[in-house]
């Protein structure tokens, strides 16, 4: 089985040269910035381009691709943010450029209207008192979830670029792949979960200001090709009611636990998670609130799979919420 890690250290100079051709202030005209990134992505180093294209075409058993050894800002990196969204005039960071170039090789960077003020580029950093379902938690486990599994236009990929790791390098991004978990499920469980609509709650941002609207969406835990299915899973939000559904989801949950792998992100990493075939989580870490805490850059990528695109969309668009029914 091919390694999910791509060593990008040989490409650093080429990638820095490509990054320098991008507009200096991404958020001043994000559509234009990402259009230019698409053009430049055609000139990515051959080995990197091939790895991205293969992952986009067929995925992998692991369910993720880790680009390691990319160039970083190092001494020029500003302090870890403490608020969101980022200032519109913030200059391009190297890891933002890497995320743009790799992401445009895959598909369309997308914002979600109800999430992070509809912004496309997200800074991910610890925040005191963050909701336990939020990516801004730090000292509690961020539980396994397929990102926005309840959204009719859920992203195909979640990209996490690392500018700064946590101080003790404790935080792990955990990934559970359905391709690894499926062989652990018996035929009865597979049949129960396949194309079965299970009630699902939604994240706080999508609740329309209501504290607890209940399970307003329906998610199929397994769907697509029965022999190579897609995954819809959220440990906190999936809310099966039928006893047989509860049992089947519990078996799936255990299987995903059994195949989980951990990835410790370090500066210069871009982790690309196949959000149609995996669930992911993050282990706790301890922030110091010293301006040097863990700092990731997140973006969601849509492709033409599963009816995500109808035509005419652009990278940098923001879309509104429609729950799966």
From Swiss-Prot:
Its EC number is 1.14.11.21. Keywords: Antibiotic biosynthesis, Iron, Metal-binding, Oxidoreductase. The keyword Transmembrane does not apply. Fe cation binds at residues 145, 147, 280. One of its GO terms (biological process) is clavulanic acid biosynthetic process. InterPro entries: AlphaKG_dependent_hydroxylases, Clavaminate_syn-like, Clavaminate_Synthase, TauD-like_sf, TauD/TfdA-like. NCBIfam families: ClavSyn_CS1 (NF043003). This is Clavaminate synthase 2. It comes from Streptomyces clavuligerus. The gene is cs2.
């Amino acid at each position: 089985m091919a390694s999910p890690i791509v060593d990008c250290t040989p490409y650093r100079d080429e990638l820095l040269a490509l990054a320098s051709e991008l507009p200096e202030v991404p958020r001043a005209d994000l559509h234009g910035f990402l259009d230019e990134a698409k053009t430049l992505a055609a000139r990515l180093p051959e080995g990197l381009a091939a790895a991205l294209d293969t992952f986009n075409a067929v995925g992998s058993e692991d369910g993720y691709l880790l680009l390691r050894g990319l160039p970083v800002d190092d001494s020029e990196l500003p302090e870890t943010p403490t608020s969101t969204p980022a200032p519109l005039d913030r200059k391009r960071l190297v890891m933002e450029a890497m995320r743009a170039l790799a992401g445009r090789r895959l598909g369309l960077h997308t914002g979600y209207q109800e999430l992070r003020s509809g912004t496309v580029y997200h800074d991910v950093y610890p925040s005191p008192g963050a909701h336990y379902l939020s990516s801004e938690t730090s000292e509690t486990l961020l539980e396994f979830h397929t990102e926005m599994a309840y959204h009719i236009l859920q992203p195909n990929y979640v990209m996490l670029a690392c500018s700064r790791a946590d101080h003790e390098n404790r935080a792990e991004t955990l990934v559970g792949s359905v391709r690894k978990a499926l062989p652990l499920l018996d035929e009865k469980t597979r049949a129960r979960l396949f194309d079965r609509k299970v009630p699902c709650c939604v994240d706080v941002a999508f609740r329309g200001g209501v504290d607890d609207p209940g399970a307003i969406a329906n998610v199929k835990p397994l769907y697509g090709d029965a022999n190579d299915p897609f995954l819809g899973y959220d440990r906190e939000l999936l809310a099966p009611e039928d006893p047989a559904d509860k049992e089947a989801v519990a078996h799936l949950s255990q299987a995903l636990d059994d195949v989980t792998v951990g990835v410790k992100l370090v500066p210069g990493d871009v982790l690309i998670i196949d959000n149609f075939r995996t669930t992911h989580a993050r282990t706790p870490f301890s922030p110091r609130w010293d301006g040097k805490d863990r700092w990731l850059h997140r973006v969601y990528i849509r492709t033409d799979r599963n009816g995500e695109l109808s035509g005419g969309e652009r990278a940098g668009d923001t879309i509104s919420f429609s729950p799966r029914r």
